[in-house]
Every structure is written in structure tokens, then in C-alpha cells.
């Protein structure tokens, strides 16, 4: 084993954060230093050249000064017997660089802690801060790392002696293994194994428990119900299915696959053909939709729980039909009170929590990062979400009790596209190969399905922790590329049937795969790829290692499938084959036995059906006492409530531009304020048709009225999507995610009431279908605190996601108030007809009350009328701004619109009934629209004719104030900047705890500025002019290599941009270059695309670059290309980082910087303003001096020069091509206008001859005007960024 020191693992402020954590835990530490340590397992010794080569490969990150660390060593490494995702990717890079003697690379972090002697409890507390005990260990000396490469022998099978000891043996196993089997299930298993005349193996019991858990089988939703002694005629699931029975229109697949499918638009799907050439394929672009929850893992380990929640949902989408394409995501969180240190709010009572779960603050600091990181690395934009905090002692249907989200809701969902011929699963033929595609088995995530089906606190802490999975999004990206290549083959798609591997691991996925196709299967356990050779059969078969799919491929198509996988470097293995007999056999060649030998009907067939006999309860809660509440105090508290407040800290961490198909993300207007009501995507690059999605949830209302909460969730999702051009209710489909504390008094009957309200009544009346959903029935946390029994129970929680087919994405209306449209009016659309019910409102919450009566949708025809008029006005472009009334009431609606428009507003309440507080803060269904004064009267008449109350309530003002009047009486007035401070301070506090606090403060200050002009545009050319047109007319399309490496995710939009400019875009994988299948000699141009090559394990883009520099074939290819006279190259984001590390073979690039961690130490997704500099770059010919917004999405974009002299040289040679600037045109030095901290705002640079340009921002994602988060109204189809691609075409003549 060789040991190689690496770069510092923690920046100064990360060390400071760790020191603060030590201080909070009463660990007396004086200083901590941390650095990466690399361990190389060799088959034979390296020579001197190879040693230097390995040292170069492992040199990344900040430069390290030679020194000897001081203090006690805590060496954190992956758990011996495992292979980390870092290891597999770094080892791949080493092999691609020709270092075949390296059997494996592994990495750890050496923490050197200077402290006085720590006692055992302090040592334990310190270690808890330094490592993840599920996947890591701590050593106290370097030599111990040798055990990382020890090989352990497989553990043997265990059986349970049911024949000898009877039922008792199974009861003991149930508890020991955390199976969560019900009494009747234990009886069922005993009866079946007695009938089979053999004892069950532990693997069979775990498999049964996972496959039949509440999580997987949805027993409560399929149960028979008796309520208050009356037998109900329908199950919950039947009531949901009723929506499809009544309105099957536009539903292509429901209730039977990993996601539902609805009819989409006809568009030109853009992808490469079998020769690798990208082209448009005009066909139906159907929409798949799925929303999952990952609540239990997120409560235990927030980052991993949220990351694998997003990853699992993405796999569900990709595994729909015979393979499909995930497109855009959503995320949501409900947690108990944050209790931010130094910022605890008046309504936040300290109730405590059990030790085994983390705090709500930890969930919201770490969980969103996990979800965002997975989406970012996979390459899916996360475009919409919600965040609610709720924890309160209330008087509800059970008297006084604490309700809240100690068990959080972590929502992960999204939409994708699927070909018409692939919507339905195919037939698994007898003898078909049954394949696992993706990462290796690891001993993590055991029993997740059963664990998440229990109320928190019913299982042991070790079992809880064992049930959390770990993530590797770059692996999932590789798998998705394989699926993409398969569905792109159309009729020749080799995939017959596909499922994702989720709860229960292979033990659930393979039986489900064959059972759904009416087949059985013969499997070989030792064919399952594994990174832990010491695992038992149960651990191999039942673990929930992520990033895996199971699928069937006919034997005659196996060679083609293998070829695709090898090109994408996606691991796969044939684990079994399909049989005609519905029997499951798992052979173990190592022990020469059969761990599983069962008829499928025992596993999945006739398990006992659940019956629930429950009693309903009604809430009795006192009304909110308004007598001691002032409007000013209400405003201060409500704008600080996380449910209402600025959610920037949850949004800028997530890529919102990848794919180049995003039309509407969360950020609105020139000031990029996060107030969008919905997300909108384009169906493709050649159309204005698209898709929209929105979220609705009003969960606290359920504490007063279950049915009202459900109706309001559905209605809110409609209100949020109403500003898009959909046309008809029948073009909207809903996902329903139901969360409940089943068994808690009153909750079961309440759940039934809520499902009935939606499934039997409201949705059929609206002609809306719910073709997909999910349930989580254990939303309760119980624990003992010094002998006192405590519990926190969530409200019955329905989260609705609406998905719609958009006719014209250009017509989408946002909440941005327009001050450039002449005389305008603000109209309040009130669907409650004057009611001001405050029960369950944010106003009640921030004054520690629940209230008495909840708002409700009293008449579905009102919502229908509202939607129909809205659709007419949206299509006519008669509405300037739109925002629905929801959390925080009318005051919040208007205030957020003013923030988005950076303007003042004045509203008059005199047309409304009720107290000041009730009028301003009720959360009845409604919306505010801005219309031209000339049209206000006619629009008002349209709404009134449709049964919707409509009131003129005010307009914009010249001053930067929000003024509320009641006739002549001033009810409230305040500077917009002060309201923005109140609204954004929660986000600032969270950002300062999580990220670089200096950056957080700079952004918080900018938000309060009254002089910031926001995003501005200055163009020195005509973007509507197609300068490439004369050359395209020649009929010659120069060949462009769209270069990608494993983990790259921005290649399709790049290909589309060059295709539009007249190039022949060709898909080129690095494996094509390394294998010699493709030569760069064929191409005039090369573009290295953005993403996360190799998961950025050796620094962003550095592993990719080194696999070129240290591989002779690749080095020769690239060197020849760069030295050619008529070649050119572009590197964007990850491609920029990669090319910056190829300086030694790119002429004229010797002064280029490399790109390192952003100053904020966070992934930054922004719309930034850049100015084109005068430079020799062929891409920016004729564009100098132009200032334009552009998408930025990266974690390592800070330009770091080798020296001050190198930076001076780069500036003096005039090769700086782009700079970040402010809205007034100055070089941006402050965050976030300079999103990464690069010196002098540098964001792009070129070679001295202008042939090679590298840039961190993404022009390919915004080459269409509709793909920009904000743009001036007068831009046409092409945004100004299209010019740079056309300039390249012009250069070739």
C-alpha cells in the first residue's frame, strides 16, 4: 500500500464551523486541521515515472504548504470491506491514465485535533462530528488503513427453526431483523412453511417483509374500512381510482407502473441516431409524472436521505414503460420549528426530540443540499418546491397535544417524457436475461421498506440507521444514458421490461419484475455485483444500494445492450433468466445451496388483507384572539415564518437551467426573486408547447377539518398553475401524496374523509384525474424523556402536485409587477366570496393559536369558473402579473409581487369585509392580478360572470413603499427594503450557518438595496440577425464533436445550439476516443460540455483532463486537434475546468487559470450578468461591450491563477473574454453578482489566437429566448447568446 498526502480537506471557515460544533458539544478542542489522504493498493510497485504520474493525478484542490501536522490523529476512511464511489471513479481514472498496476485507490480524511485529554464521552461526541458511522470508520494511525484492502470471506445463510420451535421462532426473528410483520402475517408465514415442510431462511423472511411492507404494498389504502360502526363500500385506493373512472381523458398509464403517463404535445425530440448524429424526431412527447416521499431516512440522515429520495424518484421516472427520460424535478420539506440559534421566534416552543433523529434545523441545513446535489450531478433541474415549518401544542380532535413534523416530509418528484410506443411494458419472454444495471451491492439501506412503515421510535436506533441508503448520482447518470440509448432505438429498444431498485433492494425488484410479467425467475446470487465480499446472502439480496435498475433483455439483444453499457461505462450483470413457472429460485454457488426456493404466490400472492375499524373525531378549538395583535407585529412575524419567508437558500443551491428546456423556474424578474407559482418547461428546442407543474398543500388545516385541508390542497395546486396556458382542466393531472399517523385517534377516519373529499367529490366535479400518488402512514414520533412519554404527531398531510400540458410557454404569467406598462390596476379575485376564516392560518400559527374554522373550497364551480376565465386571459396575454393568495394571505401576495417588480404598491381594503387582520391575513382561495387600467372593468366583469368575486384594490406607486389603507385610514405602511429585510432574514440566517457567512451577508445586503437595477441588457449587435445563414445555405454542415465524459450532463442542449448554427453535431464519448472508435481528425470543432465528469472526484474537470494527458492515444488525438490551423474548441463549465487543465497541449493558453471551489463553498445556480470583453475569441466576434444575463451553475468556478504574474499576463494579452458585471456595468466583486469570487469578475478566457475559448457560464442553456429566466419583452426566438455559436459557423466559411 502506498500513502499519498493530499490537499487540505477543510477551508478556514469550515474549520471554524467544526470548532463551533465542538464548542456546542462541550468538547474542549484548541485547533483542528484536516487533509485528504490517499491509499493506493498495488499489484506491483510503480517506477519513478509512474509514481510521479500518480502524484499528479492525486494533486487537486487548494495548494498545500509543506508542513508536519500537529495533534491527535483521527483518520476517517470508508468502512473496511467496502469500496466507496470515490474509489471506483478514481481507480477508473488511474486505469484510463495507463496505471494498470493500481488495483484500487481509496481516500480518507486525516483530522489532526489539538486538545487536552478528552474523556470517553467527549471522544465519542467528537467522532460523531467527524464521520458517518454507517459507511465510515475512524483509525488512530495511518498503517491501519491497510485493512481497507483486506478481503473478507462471505457470511453464511441463517435459517429460522419454525418446524422445531413454531411461531415463537418467527416472532423472535421479526424483532431481531426489524421485519415489522403483523400478527396475521406471522401466522401466514408459519402456515406456508409448514405446508412446504421446511424452515424459512432469513433472506426469505426479509424479502417477504420488504415486499409486503406498508411502504411497498399500501395495505391501509387497500384495506376494508368500518367507520363509527358503518361499513364503507370503498377502499381509499378505489376512491382515488374513481377519478380515472370518471375522467380517463388524456391518461395513457395509471396505477400500474413506476410513474403515470399523460398525453403530451407533438414536438421534435432532439437526440443522436445510431451514427451519433443529433437530429430532431417529430413525434408525440408524452409526459410522465411521479412524486415520492423519503421521510424516514431524512429524519435519520438528512443529506443522504434527501439525496437518495431524489435519486429513487428519478429512477422511477427512467424505469417507466420500456424506458423514458426524466426532465424536471421538484422538492419539498415539512419540518418542526427550526429554532435557529440567536433567531428563535416567539411561536417556537422547545418541546425536545428523541436522540435517534436529528433536529429540524439540521434537516433544513443538510437535507436540501442532498436533494439538490443529486439533481445537480444527475443533470435534472429542480424547478418548484415548498417548505413548511409546523410544531405547535394545539387543541384539536384529541384535546391538547403536540402536532408537528418531527418525522419530516421530504418530497421528491418530477416529470419526464416518453415515446408513445414505450408507454406500456413489453413482454418478458421465457429465457429472457434478467439484468441488474448500475452500481454494486453494499451493506447499506437494509430494511428500509419495513423501517419507514413504522412510527419513529418503534425500531432500534441501529436498525433505523441501517435503513438509510447512500448516493452516487454520477452512476445513475451513466445508467440513464444507457436507458436513453435504448429508447432512442425505437422499435429496436432491447429493454422488454424495467423497474428501479428501491425499497427492499433486489429482493423486491426482481420478484416484482417477473411477477408483473406473469413469469418466474432463476437467479444466481454470486452474479450480483458487490463491493463488499463479506456480505451474507440476506445482505446481498436485500440491501438498498442505490442507482440500480432491474430489466429483462431477450438473449438475441444482449450483445447490443452490452455494447451500449460498455460505451457508457455503466456496470451491468446478468443475474438470472425468466421462467414460465411462477417460482423464485436463488442459487448460491459459493455455498452450493439455494437461499430462496419459493412459489411467487407465497411471496406476493395471498397475504392477509387489512381491515380497519375506526372512530371519527371532530376538532373543537377556540378562535384566534385578535385583541392583542397589531398589524405591524403580525407583518413582522409572518414575514419571518419560514413557510412564508424568502426561500433563496433552498433554491440557489440547485441547478435550474440544465437541459436548456427550462422556461419558468422559481426565480422571477430582473431581481430574481423566488416567488414563482409553478414550473414550466419546453417540450423540445423546436416548439413553444411544453409542460407545467405546481404544488398545493395546506396541511395545518387538517387539525380543524380533514376534508377542507384536502380540498384546499387540490385547489391551491390549480391556483398555482392557472397562470400558464393550459386551456382545459382535462389537460391537468394530479399526483396525491398522503401522509398520516395511522392508528392515532381520529386520524384514520380523517384520512378516509380527506380521500373521499378529493376522490369521490372534488376531482370528479372538476374533471381532473389522480393517476399517481404515494402514501406514508407512520407520521408520528414517540420517545421517553426522563421517564416522561412524549410524542409529536403530524397533521394529516396531503401534498398535491399538478401537471399540465402547456399550449404556449410564452404566455406564462409571473408575480412580477410591471412598472413599465403604463396605468395599471391590481384586482383581487376572491373565490371565498368575502369569507375570512383564519383557522390553521400562518397568522394563527405565529401567535401560537390554531383558530376555530378553516378556509375551504365551498363550491367547485367557483374554481372552475376562475380557471376558465384565467385561461382565456392568459392566452390573450391580458394579464401582466399573477400571484395566488395562500400562506400569509393577501398582504404576503401583494408584498411578494412588489419584491419581484422592485416597486411600491398601495392597496385599499375598503371593498372587503372583516377586521384589518382578517382581511390582510386570511388564506382563503384567491389571487391578485395586475391588468392595464383600460381593461380592468371588462376583466372584472368576466370574473363576476363566472361566479368569482373581483375587487379593484389598488395599484403601483412611485415611492418604494407598501401602503395599506381602509378608505382614507392608513392601516400599515413600510419601506419595501425593510419588508424585504424581514422576508429574507430567515434565508440569510440559514445561509450564514451553512455557507460562507461573508457571502451570505453580501447577498442579504444587496436584497435590501433600493438602487440595484437588477439584470440589465446592453447589446452592440442585432440578435435577430442570423449571420450564419449565408453559410448554412451552402448546404455544408461542418462536423462538431459534442464531447462528453461519464457524468457530463449538458451535452444535448450544446448539440442543439450548434445544430441551430448550421453544424452537424455528433455525440462523442471519451470512451470512443480512448478505444479508437472515433478520431478527432474527423471534426472541425470540439466542445467539452458541462456536468460532473467522474463525479468531480479528483477536482472539477481534473480527472477528465488527466485521463487525456496521461493516456497516449488520447493525448495524441487532442494535441493534433489543437495544433491544426482550421480547428476550434469551446469548453463550458466542467468542460472549461477540463480544458484549463490541458494548458500544456493547447497553444496560447499558458496563462490560463484553473477553477477551484467557489468562494461561498457552495454550488451556485444563478442568472448572472456578464459583459463580453474585447478579445481574439472567434466566438465573440462583434459582441464586445455587450452585457447579457446568462445561466451559471457550478461549485468550482473561482479562477485561480498560478501567480499574480500569470493573472497580469492574462489581462495584458487581452485574452479575458467575459467578466461578471453589475447592473450598472461595473466589474462585479461582491457576491452574488460575482457568483464564485473570481478576480476581476473573470468568467471566460481564450487562447491568444482566439481558437479555444473556455467559460464557466452556460450559453447553450439560454440560446433560446424562452429558456431565459428573465429577458426583455422585445427578444425574438433566438436570444443574443445564439450569436456566439453562429460566429463559429461564420469563421469556417
Curated annotation (Swiss-Prot):
* Biological pathway: Purine metabolism; IMP biosynthesis via de novo pathway; 5-amino-1-(5-phospho-D-ribosyl)imidazole from N(2)-formyl-N(1)-(5-phospho-D-ribosyl)glycinamide: step 1/2
| Positions bound to Mg(2+) | 677, 716, 720, 884
UniProt domain Glutamine amidotransferase type-1: residue ranges = 1040-1293
> What is the first-listed, main subcellular location in coarse terms?
cytoplasm
InterPro entries in UniProt: Class_I_gatase-like, FGAR-AT_N, FGAR-AT_PurM_N-like, PurL_large, PurL_linker, PurM-like_C_dom, PurM-like_C_sf, PurM-like_N_sf
Location in the cell? Cytoplasm
A GO term for molecular function: metal ion binding
What is one Gene Ontology biological process annotated in the Swiss-Prot or TrEMBL record?
'de novo' IMP biosynthetic process
Keyword Acetylation set for record = no
Superkingdom per UniProt: Bacteria
Task: Describe the reaction catalysed, as an equation.
Answer: N(2)-formyl-N(1)-(5-phospho-beta-D-ribosyl)glycinamide + L-glutamine + ATP + H2O = 2-formamido-N(1)-(5-O-phospho-beta-D-ribosyl)acetamidine + L-glutamate + ADP + phosphate + H(+)
What's one Pfam family here? FGAR-AT_linker
Family per similarity comment: In the N-terminal section; belongs to the FGAMS family.
On assembly, the entry states: Monomer.
User: What biological function has been recorded for the protein in this entry?
Assistant: Phosphoribosylformylglycinamidine synthase involved in the purines biosynthetic pathway. Catalyzes the ATP-dependent conversion of formylglycinamide ribonucleotide (FGAR) and glutamine to yield formylglycinamidine ribonucleotide (FGAM) and glutamate.
Q: Which PANTHER family match?
A: PHOSPHORIBOSYLFORMYLGLYCINAMIDINE SYNTHASE
Entry protein name:
Phosphoribosylformylglycinamidine synthase
Write down the species. Answer: Shewanella denitrificans (strain OS217 / ATCC BAA-1090 / DSM 15013)
The lineage is: Bacteria, Pseudomonadati, Pseudomonadota, Gammaproteobacteria, Alteromonadales
Amino acid at each position: 500500500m502506498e500513502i499519498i498526502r493530499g490537499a487540505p480537506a477543510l477551508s478556514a471557515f469550515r474549520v471554524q464551523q467544526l470548532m463551533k460544533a465542538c464548542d456546542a458539544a462541550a468538547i474542549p478542542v484548541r485547533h483542528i486541521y484536516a487533509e485528504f489522504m490517499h491509499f493506493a493498493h498495488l499489484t506491483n510497485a510503480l517506477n519513478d515515472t509512474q509514481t510521479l504520474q500518480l502524484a499528479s493525478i492525486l494533486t487537486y484542490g487548494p495548494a498545500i504548504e509543506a508542513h508536519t501536522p500537529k495533534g491527535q490523529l483521527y483518520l476517517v476512511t470508508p468502512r473496511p470491506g467496502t469500496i466507496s464511489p470515490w474509489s471506483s471513479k478514481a481507480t477508473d481514472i488511474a486505469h484510463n491514465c495507463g496505471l494498470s498496476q493500481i488495483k484500487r485507490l481509496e481516500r480518507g480524511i486525516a483530522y489532526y485535533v489539538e486538545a487536552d485529554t478528552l474523556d470517553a464521552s467527549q471522544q465519542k461526541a467528537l467522532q460523531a462530528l467527524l464521520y458517518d458511522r454507517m459507511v465510515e470508520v475512524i483509525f488512530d494511525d495511518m498503517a491501519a488503513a491497510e485493512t481497507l484492502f483486506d478481503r473478507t470471506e462471505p457470511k453464511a445463510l441463517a435459517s429460522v427453526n419454525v418446524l422445531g420451535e413454531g411461531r415463537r421462532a418467527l416472532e423472535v426473528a421479526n424483532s431481531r431483523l426489524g421485519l415489522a410483520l403483523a400478527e396475521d402475517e406471522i401466522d401466514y408465514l408459519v402456515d406456508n412453511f409448514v405446508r412446504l415442510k421446511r424452515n424459512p431462511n432469513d433472506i426469505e423472511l426479509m424479502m417477504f417483509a420488504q415486499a409486503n411492507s406498508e411502504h411497498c404494498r399500501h395495505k391501509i389504502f387497500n384495506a376494508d374500512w368500518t367507520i363509527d360502526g358503518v361499513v364503507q363500500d370503498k377502499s381509499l385506493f378505489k376512491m382515488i381510482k374513481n377519478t380515472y373512472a370518471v375522467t380517463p381523458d388524456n391518461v395513457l398509464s395509471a396505477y400500474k407502473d413506476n410513474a403515470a403517463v399523460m398525453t403530451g404535445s407533438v414536438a421534435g425530440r432532439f437526440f443522436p441516431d445510431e451514427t451519433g448524429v443529433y437530429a430532431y424526431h417529430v413525434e408525440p412527447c408524452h409526459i410522465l409524472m411521479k412524486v415520492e416521499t423519503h421521510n424516514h431516512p431524512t429524519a435519520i440522515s438528512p443529506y443522504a436521505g434527501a439525496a437518495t429520495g431524489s435519486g429513487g424518484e428519478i429512477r422511477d421516472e427512467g424505469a417507466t414503460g420500456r424506458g423514458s427520460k426524466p426532465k424536471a424535478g421538484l422538492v419539498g420539506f415539512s419540518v418542526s420549528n427550526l429554532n435557529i440559534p440567536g433567531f428563535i421566534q416567539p411561536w417556537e416552543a422547545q418541546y425536545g426530540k428523541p436522540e435517534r433523529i436529528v433536529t429540524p434545523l439540521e434537516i433544513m441545513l443538510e437535507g436540501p443540499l442532498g436533494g439538490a446535489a443529486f439533481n445537480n450531478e444527475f443533470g435534472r433541474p429542480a424547478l418548484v418546491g415548498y417548505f413548511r415549518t409546523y410544531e405547535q401544542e394545539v387543541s384539536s380532535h384529541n384535546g391538547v397535544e403536540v402536532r408537528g413534523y418531527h418525522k419530516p416530509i421530504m418530497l421528491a418528484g418530477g416529470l419526464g417524457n416518453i415515446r408513445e410506443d414505450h408507454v406500456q411494458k413489453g413482454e418478458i419472454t421465457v429465457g429472457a436475461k434478467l439484468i441488474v444495471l448500475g452500481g454494486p451491492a453494499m451493506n447499506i439501506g437494509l430494511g428500509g421498506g419495513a423501517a419507514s412503515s413504522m412510527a419513529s421510535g418503534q425500531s432500534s436506533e441501529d436498525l433505523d440507521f441501517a435503513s438509510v441508503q447512500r448516493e452516487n448520482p454520477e452512476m445513475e447518470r451513466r445508467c440513464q444514458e444507457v436507458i436513453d440509448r435504448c429508447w432512442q432505438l425505437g422499435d429496436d429498444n432491447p429493454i422488454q421490461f424495467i423497474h428501479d431498485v428501491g425499497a427492499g433492494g433486489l429482493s423486491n425488484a426482481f420478484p416484482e419484475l417477473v411477477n408483473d410479467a406473469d413469469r418466474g425467475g432463476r437467479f444466481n446470487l454470486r452474479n450480483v455485483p458487490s463491493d463488499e465480499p463479506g456480505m451474507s446472502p440476506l445482505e446481498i439480496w436485500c440491501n438498498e444500494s442505490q442507482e440500480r435498475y432491474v430489466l429483462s433483455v431477450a438473449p438475441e439483444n444482449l450483445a447490443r445492450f452490452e455494447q451500449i453499457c460498455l460505451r457508457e461505462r455503466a456496470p451491468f450483470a446478468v443475474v438470472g433468466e425468466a421462467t414460465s413457472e411462477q417460482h423464485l429460485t436463488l442459487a448460491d454457488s459459493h455455498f452450493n445451496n439455494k437461499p430462496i426456493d419459493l412459489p411467487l404466490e407465497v411471496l406476493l400472492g395471498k397475504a392477509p388483507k387489512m381491515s380497519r375499524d375506526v372512530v371519527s373525531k371532530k376538532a373543537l378549538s377556540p378562535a384566534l384572539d385578535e385583541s392583542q395583535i397589531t398589524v405591524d407585529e403580525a407583518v413582522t412575524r409572518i414575514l419571518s415564518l419560514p413557510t412564508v419567508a424568502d426561500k433563496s437558500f433552498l433554491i440557489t443551491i440547485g441547478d435550474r437551467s440544465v437541459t436548456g428546456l427550462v422556461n419558468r423556474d422559481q426565480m422571477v424578474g430582473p431581481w430574481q426573486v423566488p416567488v414563482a407559482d409553478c414550473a414550466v418547461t419546453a417540450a423540445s428546442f423546436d416548439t413553444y408547447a411544453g409542460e407545467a407543474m405546481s404544488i398545493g398543500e395546506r396541511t395545518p388545516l387538517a387539525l380543524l377539518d380533514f376534508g377542507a385541508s384536502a380540498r384546499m390542497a387540490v385547489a391551491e395546486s390549480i391556483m398555482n398553475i392557472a397562470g400558464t396556458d393550459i386551456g382545459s382542466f382535462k389537460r391537468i393531472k394530479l399526483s396525491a401524496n398522503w401522509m398520516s399517523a395511522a392508528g392515532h385517534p381520529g386520524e384514520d377516519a380523517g384520512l378516509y374523509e380527506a380521500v373521499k373529499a378529493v376522490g369521490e367529490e372534488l376531482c370528479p366535479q372538476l374533471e381532473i384525474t389522480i393517476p399517481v400518488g404515494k402514501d406514508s402512514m407512520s407520521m408520528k414520533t414517540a420517545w421517553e424523556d426522563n421517564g416522561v412519554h412524549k410524542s409529536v404527531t403530524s397533521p394529516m398531510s396531503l401534498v398535491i402536485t399538478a401537471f399540465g400540458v402547456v399550449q404556449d410557454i410564452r404566455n406564462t404569467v409571473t408575480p412580477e409587477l410591471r412598472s413599465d406598462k403604463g396605468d395599471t390596476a391590481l384586482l383581487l379575485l376572491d373565490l371565498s366570496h368575502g369569507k375570512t376564516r383564519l383557522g390553521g392560518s400562518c397568522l394563527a400559527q405565529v401567535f401560537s393559536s390554531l383558530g376555530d374554522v378553516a378556509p375551504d373550497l365551498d363550491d367547485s364551480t367557483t374554481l372552475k369558473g376562475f380557471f376558465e376565465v384565467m385561461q382565456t386571459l392568459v392566452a390573450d396575454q391580458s394579464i401582466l402579473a399573477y400571484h395566488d393568495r395562500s400562506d400569509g394571505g393577501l398582504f404576503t401576495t401583494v408584498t411578494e409581487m412588489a419584491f419581484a417588480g422592485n416597486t411600491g404598491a398601495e392597496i385599499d381594503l375598503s371593498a372587503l369585509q372583516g377586521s384589518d387582520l382578517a382581511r390582510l391575513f386570511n388564506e382563503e382561495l384567491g389571487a391578485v392580478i395586475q391588468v392595464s387600467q383600460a381593461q380592468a372593468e371588462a376583466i372584472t366583469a368576466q370574473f363576476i360572470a363566472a361566479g368569482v368575486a373581483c375587487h379593484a384594490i389598488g395599484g403601483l406607486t412611485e415611492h418604494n413603499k407598501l401602503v395599506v389603507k381602509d378608505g382614507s385610514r392608513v392601516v400599515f405602511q413600510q419601506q419595501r427594503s425593510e419588508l424585504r429585510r424581514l422576508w429574507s432574514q430567515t434565508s440569510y440566517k440559514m445561509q450564514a450557518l451553512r455557507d460562507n457567512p461573508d457571502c451570505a451577508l453580501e447577498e442579504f445586503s444587496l436584497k435590501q438595496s433600493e438602487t440595484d437595477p437588477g439584470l440589465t441588457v446592453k447589446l452592440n449587435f442585432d440578435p435577430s440577425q442570423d449571420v450564419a445563414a449565408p453559410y448554412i445555405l451552402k448546404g455544408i454542415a461542418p462536423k462538431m464533436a459534442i464531447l462528453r465524459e461519464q457524468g457530463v450532463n449538458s451535452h444535448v442542449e450544446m448539440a442543439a445550439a450548434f445544430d441551430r448554427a448550421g453544424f452537424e453535431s455528433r455525440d462523442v464519448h471519451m470512451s470512443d476516443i480512448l478505444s479508437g472508435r472515433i478520431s478527432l481528425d474527423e471534426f472541425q470543432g470540439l466542445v467539452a460540455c458541462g456536468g460532473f465528469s467522474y463525479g468531480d472526484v479528483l477536482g472539477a474537470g481534473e480527472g477528465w483532463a488527466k485521463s487525456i494527458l496521461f493516456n497516449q492515444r488520447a493525448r495524441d488525438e487532442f494535441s493534433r486537434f489543437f495544433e491544426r490551423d482550421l480547428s476550434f474548441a469551446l469548453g463550458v463549465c466542467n468542460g472549461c475546468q477540463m480544458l484549463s487543465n490541458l494548458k500544456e497541449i493547447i497553444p496560447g493558453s499558458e496563462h490560463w487559470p484553473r477553477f477551484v471551489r467557489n468562494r461561498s463553498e457552495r454550488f451556485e445556480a444563478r442568472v448572472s450578468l456578464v459583459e463580453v470583453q474585447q478579445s481574439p475569441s472567434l466566438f465573440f466576434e462583434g459582441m464586445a461591450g455587450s452585457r447579457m444575463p446568462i445561466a451559471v451553475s457550478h461549485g468550482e468556478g473561482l479562477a485561480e491563477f498560478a501567480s499574480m504574474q500569470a493573472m497580469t499576463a492574462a489581462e495584458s494579452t487581452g485574452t479575458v473574454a467575459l467578466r461578471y458585471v453589475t447592473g450598472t456595468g461595473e466589474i462585479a466583486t461582491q457576491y452574488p453578482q460575482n457568483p464564485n469570487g473570481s478576480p476581476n469578475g473573470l468568467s471566460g478566457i481564450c487562447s491568444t489566437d482566439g481558437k479555444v475559448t473556455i467559460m464557466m457560464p452556460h450559453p447553450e442553456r439560454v440560446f433560446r429566448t424562452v429558456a431565459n429566466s428573465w429577458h426583455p419583452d422585445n427578444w425574438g426566438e433566438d436570444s443574443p447568446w445564439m450569436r456566439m455559436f453562429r460566429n463559429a459557423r461564420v469563421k469556417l466559411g
